């Protein structure tokens, strides 16, 4: 019996030596304490009922307040004229606009037909009577021959209808009693009473008076007309 008790004491001693810290197994298994954060302080309670702050209102308008009158542009009488930009300074050559150029048309050949005159031919080719007369060296633009070939400067930039035309006559009769040795005029192709009167340097009315019954719009080639002489 004594031997069993001694054996138990020996086992207990061996177990105690195997444990840390003198055999206190409970203390060895606990973790070390950690630092906890301090609790936040709550705001102190407000004594009495809650009173919100009053809103900030704009200042009241004074009794003598007068709003500013807007400044309007002065009324301009008459039509509206927009302001144009002033011309730039510097070299005047840089301020000039390009001048459009005009180029005359080609020269075409035209054979004179019955009833045509330089006036009708010039209108057909958009040119001037004197442009045609000068190119063809015509002494009198009022006279062209039937089937005559004319060089026509078409689409003339500067149409000349006056420099080669004789002024209207002011006399009522042909002096010396004759015109080229005759007092009878024979109508040629392209003639009109006006062109004949200009060639004779007499008024159109005096030529009409000398040829009663003649229709100016229907002259025939070879028709004889009386020339008033004095």
Curated annotation (Swiss-Prot):
UniProt region (3 X 4 AA repeats of Y-K-P-K), positions on chain: 50-83
Residue spans crossing the bilayer: none
Pfam families: LysM
Domain LysM: 108-152, 183-227
InterPro entries per the UniProt record, alphabetical: LysM_dom, LysM_dom_sf
Keyword Repeat applies: yes
Function description: May have roles in host-pathogen interaction, including establishment and maintenance of biotrophy, prevention of host recognition of the fungus and a barrier to host defense molecules.
Matches recorded under PANTHER family: LYSM DOMAIN-CONTAINING GPI-ANCHORED PROTEIN 2 (PTHR33734), MEMBRANE-BOUND LYTIC MUREIN TRANSGLYCOSYLASE D (PTHR33734:SF22)
Subunit text: Forms a multimeric structure.
Protein name: Intracellular hyphae protein 1
Source organism per UniProt: Colletotrichum lindemuthianum
């Amino acid at each position: 019996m004594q031997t069993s008790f001694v054996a138990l004491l020996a086992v207990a001693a061996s177990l105690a030596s195997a444990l840390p810290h003198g055999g206190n197994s409970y203390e060895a298994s606990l973790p070390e304490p950690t630092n906890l954060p301090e609790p936040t302080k709550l705001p102190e309670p407000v004594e009495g009922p809650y009173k919100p702050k009053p809103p900030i209102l704009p200042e009241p308008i004074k009794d003598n307040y007068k709003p500013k009158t807007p400044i309007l542009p002065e009324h301009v009488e008459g039509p509206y004229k927009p302001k144009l930009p002033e011309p730039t300074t510097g070299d005047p050559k840089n301020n000039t606009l390009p001048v459009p150029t005009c180029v005359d048309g080609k020269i075409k050949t035209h054979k004179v037909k019955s009833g045509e005159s330089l006036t009708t031919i010039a209108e057909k080719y958009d040119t001037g009577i004197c442009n045609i007369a000068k190119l063809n060296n015509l002494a009198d633009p009022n006279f062209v021959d039937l089937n005559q070939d004319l060089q026509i400067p078409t689409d003339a930039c500067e149409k000349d209808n006056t420099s080669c035309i004789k002024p209207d006559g002011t006399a009522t009769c042909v002096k010396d009693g004759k015109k080229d040795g005759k007092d009878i005029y024979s109508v040629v192709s392209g003639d009109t009473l006006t062109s004949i009167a200009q060639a004779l340097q007499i008024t159109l009315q005096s030529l009409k008076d000398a040829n009663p019954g003649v229709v100016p719009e229907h002259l025939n080639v070879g028709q004889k007309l009386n020339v008033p002489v004095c």
